Amino acid sequence: MAKQAAKGSAAATKRQRGKRREKKNVPRGQAHIQSTFNNTIVTITDPAGNVICWSSAGQNGFKGSRKSTPYAAQVAAENAARKAMENGMRQVEVFVKGPGAGREAAIRSLQAAGLQVTAITDVTPIPHNGCRPPKRRRV
């Protein structure tokens, strides 16, 4: 009997999903493209840096080594651009970080999706002889 009572009370206090985000009308913003050797992440923010939407190659169903391809970066950027345009975005300033293969593909697909790219800036961090890099691969 006690188990049934516990089950019923748990169902009554079941938490609701978080409320759906309201659409913000942001005509200008920033697109941050982080392209690593393993993945590409596209984050679209307002001018203050608050995240409006994001997408990545892994989020779009690519697994393993396919995440690091230019096509995966293109799909991720298209997805992020579509979400941003639903929030009223028209112009973006692009900031590219990292050495990955999807850098140019992501920028091209942002433009092809209908966003006007006003500037492209490379913000890849360059160490002043910081951490030791990974050893060279011997194949």
From Swiss-Prot:
Residues 14-23 have a biased composition (Basic residues). Residues 1-30 are annotated as: Disordered. It holds the Pfam family Ribosomal_S11. GO terms for molecular function: rRNA binding; structural constituent of ribosome. Keywords: Ribonucleoprotein, Ribosomal protein, RNA-binding, rRNA-binding. One of its GO terms (cellular component) is ribosome. It comes from the Bacteria. PROSITE patterns: RIBOSOMAL_S11. Residues 1-13 have a biased composition (Low complexity). One of its GO terms (biological process) is translation. Belongs to the universal ribosomal protein uS11 family. Located on the platform of the 30S subunit, it bridges several disparate RNA helices of the 16S rRNA. Forms part of the Shine-Dalgarno cleft in the 70S ribosome. Part of the 30S ribosomal subunit. Interacts with proteins S7 and S18. Binds to IF-3. This is Small ribosomal subunit protein uS11. It comes from Roseiflexus sp. (strain RS-1). The lineage of its organism: Bacteria, Bacillati, Chloroflexota, Chloroflexia, Chloroflexales.
